[in-house]
A protein has these predicted regions:
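Exposed, low-structure sequence patches enriched in small/polar residues
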Residues: 1-213
Length: 213
């Protein structure tokens, strides 16, 4: 277990505590971060306090099947007082085949959902991953960030907002000892939005060649 005490004169005081455990078939980590702001964050409150906590748990059910869960909570004295995020992953991996089912629910101003299924193939010089998901996020404060596979050097973590579907296909191919080809194609649509809030779909196609000498 570790702890950290932070002090910033006139701006912020904080303390953080974290820990981890690992036993047969189970392991987990936790962290708690508390902050006090001497200058109120809102004119509606006299005291500005914020506490963030997160717990991660992983269970190796059998050799090829793993269950992962992440629970995080944010408490504060101004604005929306609570923000609860619960995410679960069922992960299968055997030989060259992998699959993941994610279920993510977040509660802040309202309740939002992001779920997806992903299948993967990884063998020697070829990696391929396909993902299909849907999201229901009606408030910007309830947005959920999702890490998307992409080419090296690209940081792709979009904020899911609205009501829609998305599909992505990512490939990495080593075609020679010095060459790599990375490809990504994706499409996001919003068929479940109301007429007054309807948004156009978004399509992406990316090719990246890397040569190493």
């Amino acid at each position: 277990m570790a702890s950290l005490l932070r002090f910033y004169s006139d701006d912020l005081y904080g303390i953080a505590v974290s820990g981890a455990y690992d036993v047969k078939a189970h392991k987990g980590t936790f962290s708690v971060d508390t902050e006090y702001y001497p200058v109120p964050k809102s004119k509606d409150v006299d005291l500005s306090l914020q506490c963030k906590g997160q717990f991660n748990w992983e269970w190796q059910i059998i050799d090829c099947l793993t269950f992962k869960m992440r629970v995080s909570e944010r408490l504060r004295t101004w604005g929306v007082n609570t923000r609860t995020d619960i995410r679960t992953d069922f992960c299968y991996a055997k030989d060259c085949i992998s699959a993941t089912a994610r279920f993510n629910v977040l509660r802040c101003r309202g309740t939002s959902f992001v779920n997806y299924l992903e299948g993967g193939y990884k063998r020697n010089n070829l990696n391929v991953y396909a993902r299909q998901g849907f999201f229901i996020v009606d408030n910007w404060d309830d947005r959920i960030y999702v890490y998307e596979r992409d080419a090296p050097g690209s940081f792709n973590v979009p904020a899911m907002y609205g009501r829609g579907l998305w599909t992505s296909l990512v490939m990495a191919w080593r075609f020679a000892s010095v060459g790599r080809l990375y490809a990504r194609a994706s499409y996001t649509s919003y068929p479940f939005m109301s007429e007054e809030k309807k948004k156009p779909g978004k399509a992406e196609l990316k090719l990246q060649f890397v040569f190493r000498f």
